[in-house]
Amino acid sequence: MDANGATERFNVEAVNSQKIRQPLYAPRKKIFPKRATGTFRRFKWLIMAITLGIYYLTPFLRFDRGPFSPNQAVLVDLANRRFYFFFIEIWPQEFYYVAGLLVMAGVGLFLVTSTIGRAWCGYTCPQTVWVDLFLAVEQAVEGDRNARIKLNAAPWSLGKIVKRVTKHGIWLVIGFLTGGAWILYFADAPTLLHDFFTLHAASVAYFTVGILTATTYVFGGLMREQVCTYMCPWPRIQAAMLDENSLTVTYNDWRGEPRSRHAKKAVAEGRKVGDCIDCSACVAVCPMGIDIRDGQQLECITCALCIDACDGVMDKIGRERGLISYATLNDYNANMALAGASETTAVDPARIRDGATGKLVPGLRHTTWRSIIRPRTIVYFLVWAGIGIAMLVALSLRSTLEISALHDRNPQYVLLSDGSIRNGFKIKISNMRAEPRTVTLTLEGLPGGLMTRADTVEPPSSSLLFKLQPDAVMETRVFVRADPSALESTVTDFDFAVRAVSGEATASTHAKFEKPKEQRP
């Protein structure tokens, strides 16, 4: 109350009242994409066939590596800790090659995005490929866009139930095949298939197939565009990869505006008319449910189906194709300026067409090879190629023989009855070839050093002979002895050297020989 006892009234409004409160998440509006036809749609069919063919058929490819190695061309052998890719075999200690492949994939993604935008999202992303496949099934079972909208709005009937059960059944089969193909990369495919269907496979195989069946069905059939919009981080990241010379799917409003659904009537009335007849064909085919005419949007995956739809309309009305096209921001801005667009004036269709012929004027800018080959993309390509070349060189020069030595912790040394000092070592020798090998182990840099195997009673020798199994690691324990009078310090550095008897490979590892401090030469 104020001084006079009157109640004070406040001029304030509840900004978060029940009446105006907005939900945290926008409710999803179901999208019914129309079947598109054209160059980019055919290209997407081709990419889908290639990528799905590679995924489903690769586990069945055979590659002869000899009698001692698996003959599956691509295999992730978790039990034996090996990764096979045709003639390449990666061991656990060589995981840096896998890291190199991941770096190459990342740089390659940057390269593609900086040149042709989100082409990965629009053509080869697994989510896009499987959604395309699921949509093809939906269109085959329920019909094109109008038929699906009508079916969705219709009350439940026997016909609707049959179509829905058929569609979702096929989707589940696709999900099952997707999960089934995945596990075939981790074991011999024919053997695992037999064990799987005879219920003799490991429980993890059934669990993995079940999880991937469910995720494929949910992501590809039910969530679709929501995965790209809300779950995938790439739409947010790709903005940093684009510049004014990157190709993106663009609505060229410098020739499309002003829109008119009745162009002839508008022209007769003396109004300016652009090429866009506002038919919304570009919206009808979009799997993300956006209108490309609103400009660049986070949801756009640059699948270019709107280009096909618009080109078809332009053909029907006798206009040039390319109202929606791949374009760079620089080209777009230049053409907008040519059309007279500014902050205060709209585009003038008459400025971009020859008054006599009605064709587009020659001064318009179009995409050229300079949009792709520029300093930024060259740097990306050189980095990508450099990593690839370095990995190929490393693979071609790597040794197929490796050795490691671990000194015994307790006791560090033993004083023998003849006055010599003995140290124990755990030796691992890796035979990284798919054939048996015989190797010799020697000491380098240890004066008068001799060796014996811990599991034999043979006399000490300057070298030891070992037979290695193909593609395997041999572990053994050796005793190294030396005359302390020949050693200058309490710790002497030396090397274990291993050499194949055939002479084609050698390897060595560093070690230390210890003796007591009180021992005097």
Model-identified regions with their sequence ranges:
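Hydrophobic alpha-helical transmembrane segments in integral membrane proteins
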Residues: 389-413
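Cysteine-centered iron-sulfur cluster-binding motifs in ferredoxin-type domains/subunits
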Residues: 113-128, 220-235, 266-314
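Membrane-embedded alpha-helical bundles of multi-pass integral membrane proteins
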Residues: 2-259, 307-308, 324-383
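Short solvent-exposed strand-capping/beta-turn motif centered on an Asx-Ser/Thr pair
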Residues: 430-436, 485
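Terminal connector regions
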Residues: 482-521
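Short, solvent-exposed loop/turn segments enriched in Ser/Thr/Gly
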Residues: 420-425, 474-475, 489-494
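Intrinsically disordered, low-complexity Pro/Gly/Ser/Thr-rich segments with frequent PxxP/GP/PP motifs
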Residues: 453-485
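Short acidic, flexible loop segments centered on an aromatic residue
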Residues: 435-450
